[in-house]
């Protein structure tokens, strides 16, 4: 299996690579359009600011490459958010792969501090990605923004 991790100065690229190595998978980390297009699967990681990151993707000409991919793409953190239509972070137009808005948590409505940092339970699992993960499993989050729940959602927390 040929897995490409999109290289664009995302903060969690090495963590994703390390996780795949633990599974016996040797991914390629690349910003080369051809390598990304030829991969069986693509991982789009990310930690950062939506506006600055979108600008960087445009400069690298990866915005069009990502939008045109036909193989499975796993967006992680900001990578997932950038596949949506628009982010409130920097009032940023994103890749518009999914017609979803990325919104900032409203602090008045929450009993938590923002950014939300900590362990949450996964619920409503709707993807084969979670076949070996139990409902109510704990996962760690660090975020101030979220993708609206929609028909494209594969889990909630």
Give the location of each predicted region.
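Conserved Rossmann-like nucleotide-cofactor binding loop
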Residues: 11
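Amide-donor transfer/coupling interface in amidating biosynthetic enzymes
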Residues: 68, 101-157
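Short acidic low-complexity segments
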Residues: 27-38
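Cysteine-nucleophile active-site neighborhood
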Residues: 48-117
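Extreme N-terminal starter segment of soluble prokaryotic enzymes
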Residues: 1-4
């Amino acid at each position: 299996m040929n897995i490409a991790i999109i290289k664009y100065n995302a903060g969690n690229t090495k963590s994703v690579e390390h996780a795949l190595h633990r599974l016996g998978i040797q991914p390629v980390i690349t910003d080369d359009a051809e390598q990304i297009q030829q991969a069986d699967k693509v991982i789009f990681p990310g930690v950062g600011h939506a506006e600055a990151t979108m600008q960087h993707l445009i400069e690298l000409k990866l915005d069009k490459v990502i939008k045109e991919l036909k193989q499975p793409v796993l967006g992680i953190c900001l990578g997932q958010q950038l596949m949506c239509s628009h982010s409130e972070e920097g009032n940023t137009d994103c890749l518009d792969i999914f017609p979803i808005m990325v919104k900032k948590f409203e602090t008045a409505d929450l009993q938590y501090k923002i950014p939300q940092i900590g362990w949450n339970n996964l619920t409503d699992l709707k993807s084969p990605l979670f076949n070996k993960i139990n409902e109510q499993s704990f996962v760690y989050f660090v975020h101030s923004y979220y993708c609206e729940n929609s028909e494209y959602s594969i889990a909630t927390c």
